[in-house]
A protein has these predicted regions:
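Hydrophobic adenine-recognition pocket in adenosine-nucleotide-binding enzymes
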Residues: 15, 85, 118
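C-terminal "cap" of GNAT-fold acetyltransferases
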Residues: 4, 121, 135-147
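Acetyl-CoA-dependent GNAT
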Residues: 37-88
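A short, well-structured alpha-helix characteristic of acyl/acetyltransferase catalytic modules
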Residues: 1-52
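Conserved GNAT acetyl-CoA-binding A-motif
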Residues: 106-118
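Conserved active-site alpha-helix within GNAT-family acetyltransferase domains
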Residues: 96, 120-138
């Protein structure tokens, strides 16, 4: 995998182990609630297990915004998309731009759709995915049809 340039501020960098930065994102209980619907923060074991799974089942990238790693985004082989952005960088449309780039990646990989699981309380993510053209297909699932 190579870097994916989203725009002059955002670059997606293929995952590499960087516990010092990434563990901080997953030690925020509000972020964990958005991602896993749990208030339990991650330890290194859980973080490694998650990234090992994501990297062996898809394309996992760090999100670099203006030179700073601020989150991660993954397009799994089963077409499921996941994204995490540290709280202090949310609401800057970084996620919107990264999800759009993952849609382009899905097209390059000849996927027929992209799906995302978003919990009912996460209205911020729901609004973003709907604004990008995703359709709600179930209580927690959103899809973007590519064909």
């Amino acid at each position: 995998m190579m870097n994916r340039i989203v725009n002059d501020q955002i670059t997606l960098i293929p995952y590499y182990r960087n516990d010092e930065i990434s563990l901080l994102w997953y030690q925020d209980s509000e972020v964990c609630k958005q991602v896993d619907n749990t208030d339990q923060i991650y330890d290194l074991t859980k973080l490694h297990k998650m990234y090992d799974y994501l990297t062996s089942h898809g394309s996992c990238y760090y999100i670099q915004y203006e030179g700073v790693l601020v989150g991660d985004v993954t397009l799994q082989d089963n077409s499921e998309l996941s994204i995490v952005i540290s709280k202090e960088y949310q609401n800057l449309h970084i996620g919107r731009r990264c999800v759009s780039e993952m849609i382009h990646l899905a097209k390059e990989q000849n996927m027929v759709k992209v799906s995302a699981q978003i919990y009912p309380f996460n209205t911020q993510s729901q609004r973003m995915f709907l604004a990008l053209g995703f359709q709600k297909v179930d209580e927690e699932w959103y899809e973007y049809k590519l064909i």
